[in-house]
Amino acid sequence: MAVTTLNKMADVLTRVNGNSQMASQCTDLANEVKAALQKYAVYDHPKYGKIYAYEVDGMGNHLLMDDANVPSLLAMPYLGDVDIDDPIYQNTRRFVWSKDNPYFFRGKAGEGIGGPHMGYDMAWPMSLIMRAMTSRDDKEIKECVQMLMDTDANTGVIHESFDIKDSMHYTRPWFAWQNTLFGELILKLVKDGKTDLLISCKK
């Protein structure tokens, strides 16, 4: 995210402010961070191959997990940080949406990624939204949209998190951030010509 933001800053500084010196500093720092990420943040996983680590310390230690909050590893293409077809991202995507991610939860009510501050078995709808946003697979997208509809506890809105065993147990009856992202997802799917997919989802 830092690399993407620094490059955007350089573009604004060049085209709007005319400050080529500061723009160059931003670009140099972006390139330095990008090189460091490739050197230190890529972990060769025995099951998934090369994946992006959630945290590194620059001394060879890696924290392998993902958190539902955006920015996240899952959301990197959505934020413009990597190409959706980047093989390391695709490996990472498989990792974070699996039991190998300590904060991925699956139960009879649904599945998704949560995070350390919500505790175990509480999945965030935001992770389902980001999974759909970063997918080219219509079946996967439909599964995400359907699950978002099925885990709203009959309220018609998206919550902060839901219990994977019983979605009637949730946190925050109204969570504007995720509801806004859900609206963005629906608009994206309509723009992408996937109205039939949306219509096929049942409530």
Which residues make up each language-model segment?
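Active-site catalytic microenvironments for nucleophilic, acid-base chemistry
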Residues: 8, 12-15, 135, 188
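Long alpha-helical scaffolds in large eukaryotic adaptor/regulatory proteins
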Residues: 13-20, 193
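Extended ligand-binding clefts on enzyme/binding-domain cores
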Residues: 1-4, 16, 23-124, 134-136
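C-terminal capping/lid segments that line or modulate ligand- or cofactor-binding pockets
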Residues: 63-83, 120-203
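Heptad-repeat amphipathic alpha-helical coiled-coil interaction surface used
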Residues: 3, 10-11, 23, 30, ...
